[in-house]
Amino acid sequence: MIPAGLANPFAALFGGGTPIDFGKNFKDNRRILGDGKTYRGLIFGSLCGTLIGLLQILLAPHIAPYLAGFIDPSLLVGYSYIALITMPFGALLGDIVKSFFKRRLGFERGAMLPIADQLDFVAGAWVLTFLLDPEWLLANFTIWVAIAVILIIPVFHVAFNIAGYKLGKKDVPW
């Protein structure tokens, strides 16, 4: 989940430029996505998340022996190059889809929508990965792992958003 979880902060950090919706409105006269969803953010967020995943793959064999008493080391060596791309890219797609629906509901950019704001990227990462690499997803995200992710991710998400806000990369701390 680390590549998926870090894709969004990297998108915010390196984003800006041309909005994905090109500044256009939907048929409800509201922006399709808003200025916060840009091509540069999508590209660099996805690339950075993928690079983080690649780093995980490269380090896993070296870290596994030290974690042997805590987790099964074989869990650290099962990787997928498809998931390496789909997890961060899917995370950003999940955020984009959520933004689309927030605009339809009348939420402005930066408006808080609890739970959806924290778990949109998890849903996007899992859905895209399930569509393109279901075997890897189901092998790595058992029901207990999925529950743990759903419970833990919101805490990390809020912490990263507060950090982004304090660094001046986000307009709001959520």
Curated annotation (Swiss-Prot):
GO terms for cellular component: plasma membrane. It holds the Pfam family CarS-like. Its cofactor is Mg(2+). Keywords: Cell membrane, Lipid biosynthesis, Lipid metabolism, Magnesium, Membrane, Phospholipid biosynthesis, Phospholipid metabolism, Transferase, Transmembrane, Transmembrane helix. The gene is carS. This is CDP-archaeol synthase. The chain crosses the membrane at residues 51-71, 74-94, 112-132, 136-156. Pathway: Membrane lipid metabolism; glycerophospholipid metabolism. Its EC number is 2.7.7.67. GO terms for molecular function: CDP-2,3-bis-(O-geranylgeranyl)-sn-glycerol synthase activity. PANTHER family: CDP-ARCHAEOL SYNTHASE. GO terms for biological process: glycerophospholipid biosynthetic process. Belongs to the CDP-archaeol synthase family. NCBIfam families: PRK04032.1.
